[in-house]
Structures are given as structure tokens and as C-alpha cells.
Design a protein with these regions (language model features):
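Metallo-beta-lactamase
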Residues: 82-95, 196-207, 215-217, 222-317
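Histidine-centered divalent metal-coordination motifs
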Residues: 120-126, 149, 229-231, 235, ...
């Protein structure tokens, strides 16, 4: 949803990554009204589910962030001769989410077990409880296995051990390079080394690999894995041609733009270009596809939403480039250009990653060039005058 304080055209959603807070509830924006929501304002209550297609149910769990919920999915399944359910995404590991899942297990599964857990990507709200659900539903004879891309399984293992990510010494040094020089803020970033592990204390030791182009049969229906890049290392969306449904994960969201960040372990990455290229692949799906996003309501209008997201990023790229033409700018200098609202520490870490992503895309395009100063800070200069 656009930032209410933004002066940007309503047709271009404001730059709110999925991990940053959505603006307060209010009238739908022009961008949002261009989409069709077949379920209207219907939402599943916590611990309950809502059918969105035959054999496919919607579960909604709370998150302790300003973006206060995640959508999870139950798919009726038959696996290795056993009747049950496949769960897509899990929520973070906390007592409230476990309690909500227990309600789902008791009242929404028709007395059947969870057979496997598919995770779209390694972010905490998606993989956090994968270890608990798979352990809870595994038996001596049959494992309830985690299915995930290999890249994201390895990334989750590292992050749960405090390696990489948006906190700790490496992150603080990376943010300082890009102009975040406030000592108090950097000290707080250094203390966030265990932030991911607090929501994902454990990742299943074994998994089954999802990869681009793989067809997974769930309940007799084929689901094609579509890899996407830029938001996570190897995000997997699931498309059912027969049902006309796309479980988009975080790749396409109806109200906010997906967070696309550069992280310190891959400091020169051009993740925004990867993300935009991934959206182009999703554009080729049928126009009437029902999109089941991880945040927000199920919607139709996939191509329209992709157009909006691309226009949004093109506008932000132009603004970032103009700022660098006016004077050499750090990524931190660009925060008030790209995010016209007050950011707390949690939001600032994601916003810094996204600001770097935008200047790196401009760098790839030859529109800016880096200049490392004697102060140890990197500034970006436009290659041509404004």
C-alpha cells in the first residue's frame, strides 16, 4: 500500500519492502483497485482455514512485525500411499504460532496427518517452524520431509547459526561502507547477530530438493516449481496449470513491494535486476491465474501487478540516479529518497539493503560509478549529468 505521506503518483506503489511495515489500513490505492480479489475481504481466523480452490485451504498466522501476518497453505495430498496434507510455508517459531498450528491440526485436517512441508524460501516467517512441524508429524516408518531449494536450505542453515544476514559485525561493516556511520545504530546492528536464529532456532537436517522446472504431484495435481531470484537466494513459487493457481510466496505481493536487498556475504550482487528478470518469467503465466501471495489477499491480475512493480522500481531507480547526479551519494543518503517515512532499526537494515540494490542495478546499467573515499565510505556518482 502506498505511504500516505508520499507525493508519488498513486499508480506507483511506494517503496515498502515486504519486511517493512505496511501503511495503516485505509482506502485502497489506485494500484490495489486495479487488481481483482475473488474472495473479497474474507480472511481465515487464526487457527482456522478457508477454502480457496478444491483441496487447497488458506491459513493465516500472526507476525510480530508491522507487516503483521503471513499466509500459509494446506493442500490435500496422497503421498506414498498415505492420505494427508502438504503444508506450504510455516510461520516463525514462537509460542503463538505453535498454538495456532495446534488448532489447525486439531480442527482443519479432517483427522489426517501432515505428509510433507514445502517452503518457498529461507526467510524466518516461511521456514521458522519447519523443524517443529516435520518432527511432529514424522513417524518411525515415514518421515515428514522438508521440501525446499538447495540454495535456501543451505542459506537457512548458515543464518540459523548467525552467519551472514542483516546483523552482526559483517553487516555493520557493510552498512558503514555504504554510509551508515552513526555509532549507536552500528552498535545495535552488531548486536543483531542472533536475530534470525531467534525466529529459526533450528533447520531440519534433511530435505528434499525443489528446483526450477520440477513438477511436484500434490493430491494428483501437478505443480511446477518456478525459481525466482533477488528476494531470496533461490525462491520457489508453485504453479498449477490445471487449477490456474500460483502460490507466489513473496515474489508477487498485492499491497507492498517485495524486499530486494544486497547482503554483506555477496556485497556486489545485482539482486534487483535478478528480481525484475524473475518477474518477467512469471508474466508468461495465463492472465486469469489466481495468485496466492504470502502477504495480502489472493488476487487476479498478475500481469497488472508485475507492471506496477516494474514501474515502481523504474521510478525509484530514476530518483536514485538523479540524487547521485546532484552530488555523489551513499546508499544511506538515498534512504530518505527511497523511503519517505521514519524507519526504526529493523526497517533500516532492510532499507539499507534495498538502497544498495538500487545503486547496484544502476551500476550494472552504467548509470552510476562507485567512489571509495578516504573515510572508508562508498559514494555513487552519476556517469552523466542530470
Amino acid at each position: 500500500m502506498p505511504d500516505p505521506s508520499s507525493t508519488r503518483p498513486a499508480a506507483v506503489p511506494a517503496a515498502l519492502p515486504a519486511d517493512l511495515p505496511a501503511a495503516p489500513s485505509g482506502p485502497a490505492s489506485a494500484a490495489e483497485t486495479a487488481l481483482h480479489y475473488p474472495l473479497g475481504d474474507s480472511l481465515p481466523q487464526v487457527g482456522c482455514s478457508l477454502e480457496v480452490a478444491p483441496g487447497l485451504r488458506w491459513v493465516r498466522m500472526a507476525l510480530p512485525f508491522a507487516l503483521d501476518h503471513i499466509n500459509l497453505w494446506l493442500l490435500r495430498d496422497r503421498l506414498d500411499g498415505r492420505e494427508g496434507w502438504t503444508v506450504v510455508d510455516c510461520g516463525i517459531d514462537d509460542e503463538a504460532t505453535r498454538a495456532a498450528w495446534e488448532q489447525v491440526f486439531s480442527h482443519e485436517l479432517q483427522g489426517l496427518p501432515v505428509l510433507r512441508v514445502l517452503v518457498t524460501h529461507m526467510h524466518p516467517d516461511h521456514i521458522g517452524l519447519a523443524h517443529w512441524i516435520t518432527e511432529r508429524w514424522s513417524t518411525a516408518d515415514q518421515a515428514c520431509r522438508l521440501w525446499i531449494s538447495s540454495t535456501d536450505w543451505h542459506a537457512a542453515q548458515m543464518a540459523s547459526q548467525g552467519i551472514g544476514g542483516a546483523g552482526g559485525d559483517m553487516a555493520a561493516d557493510f552498512f558503514r561502507l555504504h554510509g551508515l556511520v552513526d555509532a549507536a545504530v552500528l552498535a545495535q546492528v552488531r548486536q543483531r547477530r542472533g536475530h534470525y536464529a531467534g525466529m529459526v532456532p533450528q533447520v531440519p537436517a534433511r530435505y528434499r530438493r525443489l528446483m526450477d522446472g520440477l513438477d511436484v504431484a500434490i493430491g494428483g495435481t501437478g505443480w511446477r516449481c518456478l525459481a525466482g531470484y533477488g528476494h531470496a537466494p533461490e525462491h520457489i513459487s508453485l504453479h498449477s496449470p490445471a487449477q490456474g493457481v500460483l502460490i507466489s510466496g513473496d515474489m508477487v505481493l498485492p499491497r507492498v513491494s517485495t524486499n530486494v536487498s544486497v547482503y554483506p556475504m555477496e556485497p556486489e550482487a545485482d539482486v534487483l535486476t535478478l528480481f525484475l528478470n524473475s518477474l518477467e518469467r512469471l508474466r508468461t503465466l495465463p492472465a486469469g491465474t489466481l495468485v496466492l501471495p504470502s502477504h495480502g489477499r489472493p488476487f487476479r491480475g498478475l500481469q497488472t501487478r508485475i507492471d506496477q512493480l516494474q514501474a515502481h522500481h523504474e521510478a525509484r531507480l530514476a530518483e536514485a540516479r538523479d540524487a547521485c547526479a546532484a552530488r555523489p551519494s551513499t546508499a544511506a543518503d538515498l534512504l530518505p529518497v527511497l523511503f519517505r517515512r521514519t524507519l526504526d532499526l529493523h526497517q533500516t537494515t532492510f532499507a539499507m539493503g534495498e538502497a544498495v540494490a538500487h545503486v547496484h542495478a544502476l551500476w550494472t546499467q552504467g548509470r552510476v560509478t562507485p567512489e571509495d573515499g578516504r573515510d572508508g565510505v562508498r559514494r555513487w556518482r552519476a556517469t552523466t549529468p542530470a
